[in-house]
Amino acid sequence: MDKNLTLLTDFYELTMMNGYLQNGMADKVAVFDLFFRQGNESTFCIACGLEQAIDYIKNISFGKEEIEYLRSLGTFGEDFLSRLAGFKFKGDVRALPEGTVVFPNEPLMVIKGSVFEAQLLEAALLNIVNFQTLIATKAARVVRAARGRGVLEFGLRRAQAPDAAVYGARAAVIGGCVGTSNVLASMLFDTDPKGTHAHSWIMSFDDELSAFRAYAELYPTNCLLLIDTYDTLKSGLPNAITVFRELKEKGY
């Protein structure tokens, strides 16, 4: 998770910035609102991603490597590259706290600054905030549907790369999940990891009940059992009930 995401932007942001400079408009004050329109499945969203958005803004820096790469494109003059070398966002950021319920056309973030500076932020902020807000909102809807029962986040293996897995887990917890199976995310964001066991655990034993009992013996106070390895209703659920009754008899 690179702290310097300066070039995490669409090329047209840079060509527009250069255009502002060449037309004497670079210092013109601009205001950008980050918002969403009417959703298809929900009338609200859960704001998320602000912490990473602020980290991104604070760490913007066009170093030698970035400048040399942009110079190699043959698109930009030295006056533009020189200004990028000294780039530091000096504008204002207003935003809703993470976890806030947000409605269509209500800004999650408002960026005010010179159009030269503010333009650069567009693509990265949309990437950061849109993804985490999407996950937090979906998590909130699932949690509401669960009606008070705890919901865990197990999305690591289906996430779109490691960063998405970590920040997706974070967003899910902000959206109301009680925990995540992602150990790295748990460490980074100071939560306790949660989880069951894999089908491979069950299949490593002679039978499902023996596997459940072995797991329960190891983790009696934190025992979650996966019941769909063979037959959920005919074996998984009855065997799990048997093991949990045995734990109860032992005082757990």
PLM segments and residue spans:
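Ordered alpha/beta subdomains of enzyme catalytic regions
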Residues: 1-219, 246-249
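Acidic, glycine-rich loop-and-beta core segments that form the ion-binding/anion-interacting portion
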Residues: 210-252
